[in-house]
Amino acid sequence: MSEYSIFTSESVSEGHPDKMADQISDAILDAIIKDDPHARVAVETMVKTGMAVVAGEVRTNTYVELEDIVRQVILDIGYDSSEKGFDGASCAVLNGIGKQSADIAIGVDEAEEKEMGAGDQGLMFGFATDETDTLMPAPVYYSHRLVERQAKLRKNSTLPWLRPDAKSQVTLRYDNGKPVAVDAVVLSTQHSPDIKLADLREAVMEEIIKPVLPEEWLHKDTLYHVNPTGIFVIGGPMGDCGLTGRKIIVDTYGGMARHGGGAFSGKDPSKVDRSAAYAGRYVAKNIVAAGLASKCEIQVSYAIGVAEPTSISVNTFGTGKISDSAIVDLVREHFDLRPRGIIEMLDLRKPIYRPTASYGHFGREGFSWEKTDKTEALKAAL
């Protein structure tokens, strides 16, 4: 927020164990929803040395080869040998998936009036800010780009000693609410045992950090922490147990906006934890893109089995060109925030979810909730 003079956010790579779990859950969701767009899916994953455990509730008319999906995701990430601490080809895959509760289903199923109740109660937030071209907070945006580049250089063998697990953290200095300098960068990456620490640190600086961060933000006092603990050979599920839904701040706005607490991955769009958070981003981004405010946070809330949101509120942090209450009226006029309305507005019954499960659900083009197609209608209020 603008009151902070310094702000820090972090990200993790696709090879981080929690992100592995997210990607597995979303790959299973995609496989099911591809054949059965109206399926109900809530899939959780745990990964630890030598095994992946999948559990949850599913209601569907299709069948998917769950074990094959799990193995392929792990191999795609890059865990393909025991030398790396995990091998998707040989790990155990345990299946604990059951059916969706009939009590939940009855409140969510669509009635004749096209109403569809929310899959659960809860509160969700959406956010946008004009401090980057993507209308995302700069600290989390650049944190994502660092680990994304780490994965790219690992996969194309530019830095062949890189391994899949990595974390980044970026601390930015703000002046009048705008980022102006990098105070600190942390990048920890798993690596093969044959690379010297000095060589690793130099390569990470020259090939990952400097190409990603704006040169004009780097200064003589910027702190760089590259693998600050030294050796990082043991990583991934061998180093830490990974669970779906444990990186909800990485998935959203890096802590710069509030969070309702609900995770995204493994959940079909009838779950408002996911779909309403996507809608919140869509609404907030269009408000900022339309010039109604330079920063916008929206909160929506729901009751299980009820279609209409129990509340819609907006905070523009004093940057609004019109009042926050007037913006709420515009939101109600131009955006359908009932669960079915969100699904149709954002075309969410498609197998689009696995790519969201690494490097952030927001701020990347190609997702329907990143469109700014409502800006002209919203500008009419100015």
Swiss-Prot record:
It is an enzyme of class 2 (transferase). Pathway: Amino-acid biosynthesis; S-adenosyl-L-methionine biosynthesis; S-adenosyl-L-methionine from L-methionine: step 1/1. InterPro entries: ADOMET_SYNTHASE_CS, S-AdoMet_synt_C, S-AdoMet_synt_central, S-AdoMet_synt_N, S-AdoMet_synthetase, S-AdoMet_synthetase_sfam. The keyword DNA-binding does not apply. ATP binds at H16, D165, A166, K167, D240, R246, K247, A263, K267. Disulfide bonds: none annotated. Its EC number is 2.5.1.6. GO terms for cellular component: cytoplasm. Transmembrane segments: none annotated. Binds 2 divalent ions per subunit. Binds 1 potassium ion per subunit. Mg(2+) binds at D18. K(+) binds at E44. L-methionine binds at E57, Q100, D240, K271. Gene3D superfamilies: 3.30.300.10. CDD domains: S-AdoMet_synt (cd18079). Its cofactor is Mg(2+); K(+). It catalyses: L-methionine + ATP + H2O = S-adenosyl-L-methionine + phosphate + diphosphate. It is found in: Cytoplasm. SUPFAM superfamilies: S-adenosylmethionine synthetase. Residues 100-110 are annotated as: Flexible loop. Homotetramer; dimer of dimers. NCBIfam families: metK. HAMAP family: S_AdoMet_synth1. Catalyzes the formation of S-adenosylmethionine (AdoMet) from methionine and ATP. The overall synthetic reaction is composed of two sequential steps, AdoMet formation and the subsequent tripolyphosphate hydrolysis which occurs prior to release of AdoMet from the enzyme. Belongs to the AdoMet synthase family. This is S-adenosylmethionine synthase. It comes from Alcanivorax borkumensis (strain ATCC 700651 / DSM 11573 / NCIMB 13689 / SK2).
